Protein backbone atom coordinates (compact mmCIF):
# COMPACT_ATOMS: atom_id res chain seq x y z
CA UNK A 1 0.00 0.00 0.00
CA UNK A 2 1.40 3.37 -1.02
CA UNK A 3 1.63 6.03 1.66
CA UNK A 4 0.33 9.43 0.60
CA UNK A 5 1.60 12.70 2.01
CA UNK A 6 -0.62 15.71 2.45
CA UNK A 7 1.88 18.41 1.50
CA UNK A 8 -0.53 21.21 2.36
CA UNK A 9 -0.88 19.82 5.87
CA UNK A 10 2.90 19.44 6.23
CA UNK A 11 3.48 22.98 4.98
CA UNK A 12 0.85 24.34 7.37
CA UNK A 13 2.49 22.59 10.33
CA UNK A 14 5.89 23.92 9.28
CA UNK A 15 4.53 27.48 9.18
CA UNK A 16 3.00 27.02 12.62
CA UNK A 17 6.33 25.77 14.00
CA UNK A 18 8.17 28.71 12.44
CA UNK A 19 5.64 31.13 13.92
CA UNK A 20 5.97 29.59 17.38
CA UNK A 21 9.77 29.68 17.12
CA UNK A 22 9.66 33.35 16.14
CA UNK A 23 7.39 34.14 19.10
CA UNK A 24 9.72 32.32 21.48
CA UNK A 25 12.77 34.11 20.09
CA UNK A 26 11.00 37.46 20.47
CA UNK A 27 10.31 36.68 24.13
CA UNK A 28 13.92 35.71 24.72
CA UNK A 29 15.14 38.91 23.06
CA UNK A 30 12.72 41.06 25.09
CA UNK A 31 13.18 39.67 28.61
CA UNK A 32 10.15 37.38 28.57
CA UNK A 33 7.69 39.90 27.08
CA UNK A 34 5.77 38.56 24.08
CA UNK A 35 4.80 40.41 20.90
CA UNK A 36 1.14 40.84 21.94
CA UNK A 37 2.11 42.61 25.17
CA UNK A 38 4.46 44.93 23.29
CA UNK A 39 1.73 45.75 20.75
CA UNK A 40 -0.75 46.53 23.53
CA UNK A 41 1.76 48.84 25.21
CA UNK A 42 2.40 50.62 21.90
CA UNK A 43 -1.35 51.13 21.39
CA UNK A 44 -1.70 52.68 24.86
CA UNK A 45 1.24 55.02 24.21
CA UNK A 46 -0.16 55.96 20.81
CA UNK A 47 -3.52 56.91 22.38
CA UNK A 48 -1.75 58.91 25.09
CA UNK A 49 0.07 60.98 22.45
CA UNK A 50 -2.99 61.59 20.28
CA UNK A 51 -2.21 58.92 17.72
CA UNK A 52 1.33 60.08 16.97
CA UNK A 53 3.91 57.56 15.76
CA UNK A 54 5.77 56.05 18.71
CA UNK A 55 9.45 55.23 18.88
CA UNK A 56 10.88 53.28 21.80
CA UNK A 57 14.59 53.30 22.53
CA UNK A 58 16.84 52.42 25.43
CA UNK A 59 19.06 54.91 27.19
CA UNK A 60 22.74 54.39 26.50
CA UNK A 61 24.63 53.07 29.45
CA UNK A 62 27.30 55.43 30.81
CA UNK A 63 29.66 52.47 30.47
CA UNK A 64 29.22 52.52 26.68
CA UNK A 65 31.54 55.55 26.55
CA UNK A 66 34.35 53.70 28.28
CA UNK A 67 37.26 53.03 25.90
CA UNK A 68 38.78 49.56 25.99
CA UNK A 69 41.07 47.19 24.14
CA UNK A 70 40.69 43.41 24.34
CA UNK A 71 43.67 41.10 24.43
CA UNK A 72 42.78 37.82 22.72
CA UNK A 73 44.05 35.67 25.56
CA UNK A 74 44.30 32.29 23.83
CA UNK A 75 46.32 33.83 21.01
CA UNK A 76 48.58 35.63 23.47
CA UNK A 77 49.05 32.37 25.34
CA UNK A 78 50.08 30.63 22.10
CA UNK A 79 52.36 33.52 21.12
CA UNK A 80 54.15 33.55 24.48
CA UNK A 81 54.46 29.77 24.70
CA UNK A 82 56.01 29.69 21.23
CA UNK A 83 58.23 32.77 21.55
CA UNK A 84 56.34 34.51 18.75
CA UNK A 85 57.12 37.96 20.18
CA UNK A 86 60.41 39.40 21.36
CA UNK A 87 60.38 41.15 24.73
CA UNK A 88 60.50 44.60 23.13
CA UNK A 89 57.65 43.70 20.76
CA UNK A 90 55.47 42.63 23.70
CA UNK A 91 56.30 45.81 25.59
CA UNK A 92 55.53 47.90 22.52
CA UNK A 93 52.10 46.28 22.06
CA UNK A 94 51.28 46.72 25.73
CA UNK A 95 52.22 50.39 25.58
CA UNK A 96 50.42 51.30 22.36
CA UNK A 97 47.12 49.52 23.08
CA UNK A 98 45.93 52.78 24.71
CA UNK A 99 46.21 54.49 21.31
CA UNK A 100 43.92 52.08 19.41
CA UNK A 101 40.91 53.77 17.88
CA UNK A 102 37.61 52.02 18.55
CA UNK A 103 36.61 49.67 15.71
CA UNK A 104 39.32 50.76 13.25
CA UNK A 105 42.17 49.46 15.48
CA UNK A 106 44.33 52.24 14.07
CA UNK A 107 47.06 53.82 16.22
CA UNK A 108 45.79 57.39 16.60
CA UNK A 109 46.74 60.53 18.48
CA UNK A 110 43.50 60.85 20.49
CA UNK A 111 41.06 57.98 21.02
CA UNK A 112 38.44 60.36 22.43
CA UNK A 113 38.32 62.61 19.37
CA UNK A 114 36.10 62.09 16.33
CA UNK A 115 38.80 63.79 14.29
CA UNK A 116 41.65 61.62 15.53
CA UNK A 117 44.65 61.31 13.22
CA UNK A 118 46.89 58.29 12.63
CA UNK A 119 50.21 58.59 14.42
CA UNK A 120 53.47 58.34 12.54
CA UNK A 121 56.34 56.30 13.94
CA UNK A 122 58.00 59.57 14.98
CA UNK A 123 54.88 60.61 16.90
CA UNK A 124 54.64 57.19 18.55
CA UNK A 125 58.29 57.45 19.57
CA UNK A 126 57.64 60.88 21.08
CA UNK A 127 54.61 59.63 23.03
CA UNK A 128 56.53 56.61 24.32
CA UNK A 129 59.59 58.77 25.04
CA UNK A 130 61.95 56.66 22.99
CA UNK A 131 63.83 57.06 19.71
CA UNK A 132 62.29 56.69 16.26
CA UNK A 133 64.84 54.12 15.05
CA UNK A 134 63.79 51.72 17.81
CA UNK A 135 60.10 52.14 16.99
CA UNK A 136 60.83 51.70 13.29
CA UNK A 137 62.68 48.44 13.95
CA UNK A 138 59.86 47.05 16.11
CA UNK A 139 57.13 48.11 13.69
CA UNK A 140 58.93 46.57 10.71
CA UNK A 141 59.34 43.30 12.61
CA UNK A 142 55.64 43.23 13.56
CA UNK A 143 54.68 44.01 9.97
CA UNK A 144 56.64 40.94 8.85
CA UNK A 145 54.79 38.86 11.45
CA UNK A 146 51.37 40.09 10.32
CA UNK A 147 50.66 41.87 13.60
CA UNK A 148 50.78 45.36 12.06
CA UNK A 149 49.69 46.63 8.66
CA UNK A 150 51.12 49.89 7.37
CA UNK A 151 48.53 51.40 5.03
CA UNK A 152 49.87 54.16 2.79
CA UNK A 153 47.65 57.13 2.15
CA UNK A 154 47.57 60.22 -0.03
CA UNK A 155 50.80 62.01 -0.90
CA UNK A 156 50.14 65.77 -0.80
CA UNK A 157 51.66 67.82 -3.60
CA UNK A 158 55.05 69.21 -2.69
CA UNK A 159 55.48 66.83 0.25
CA UNK A 160 58.18 64.16 0.02
CA UNK A 161 56.80 61.72 2.57
CA UNK A 162 53.57 59.82 1.95
CA UNK A 163 51.04 59.72 4.79
CA UNK A 164 50.33 56.33 6.34
CA UNK A 165 48.43 54.66 9.15
CA UNK A 166 49.37 51.73 11.37
CA UNK A 167 46.74 49.11 12.21
CA UNK A 168 46.99 46.32 14.79
CA UNK A 169 45.75 42.82 13.93
CA UNK A 170 42.49 42.29 15.89
CA UNK A 171 43.43 38.65 16.45
CA UNK A 172 46.05 39.98 18.88
CA UNK A 173 44.45 43.11 20.37
CA UNK A 174 41.10 44.58 19.39
CA UNK A 175 39.39 47.79 20.42
CA UNK A 176 35.89 46.82 19.41
CA UNK A 177 33.29 44.05 19.41
CA UNK A 178 34.89 40.68 18.70
CA UNK A 179 31.79 39.44 16.87
CA UNK A 180 31.63 42.50 14.63
CA UNK A 181 35.10 43.22 13.25
CA UNK A 182 35.05 46.04 10.69
CA UNK A 183 35.07 44.85 7.07
CA UNK A 184 37.90 47.23 6.15
CA UNK A 185 40.01 45.93 9.02
CA UNK A 186 39.42 42.34 7.90
CA UNK A 187 40.54 43.25 4.39
CA UNK A 188 43.75 44.85 5.67
CA UNK A 189 44.80 41.65 7.40
CA UNK A 190 43.45 39.11 4.91
CA UNK A 191 46.95 38.44 3.55
CA UNK A 192 48.20 37.78 7.10
CA UNK A 193 45.81 34.89 7.81
CA UNK A 194 48.35 32.25 6.76
CA UNK A 195 50.79 33.59 9.38
CA UNK A 196 48.23 32.91 12.11
CA UNK A 197 46.94 29.51 10.98
CA UNK A 198 48.39 27.81 14.08
CA UNK A 199 46.87 30.33 16.48
CA UNK A 200 43.81 28.96 18.31
CA UNK A 201 41.46 31.92 17.73
CA UNK A 202 40.51 33.58 14.45
CA UNK A 203 38.04 36.47 14.63
CA UNK A 204 37.57 36.35 10.85
Swiss-Prot record:
Signal peptide: none annotated. InterPro entries: HTH_MarR-typ, WH-like_DNA-bd_sf, WH_DNA-bd_sf. The keyword Nucleotide-binding does not apply. Transmembrane segments: none annotated. Keywords: Plasmid. SUPFAM superfamilies: Winged helix' DNA-binding domain. Pfam families: MarR_2 (PF12802). GO terms for molecular function: DNA-binding transcription factor activity. The keyword GTP-binding does not apply. Possibly involved in pGI2 replication mechanism. This is Uncharacterized 23.6 kDa protein. It comes from Bacillus thuringiensis. The lineage of its organism: Bacteria, Bacillati, Bacillota, Bacilli, Bacillales.
Amino acid sequence: MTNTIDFKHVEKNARIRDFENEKEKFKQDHNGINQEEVNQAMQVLSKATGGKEIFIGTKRSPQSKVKFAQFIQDNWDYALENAFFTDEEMLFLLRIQRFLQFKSNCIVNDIHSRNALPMSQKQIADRLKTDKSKISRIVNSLVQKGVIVKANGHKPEGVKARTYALFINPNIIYSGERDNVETTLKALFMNSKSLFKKFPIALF
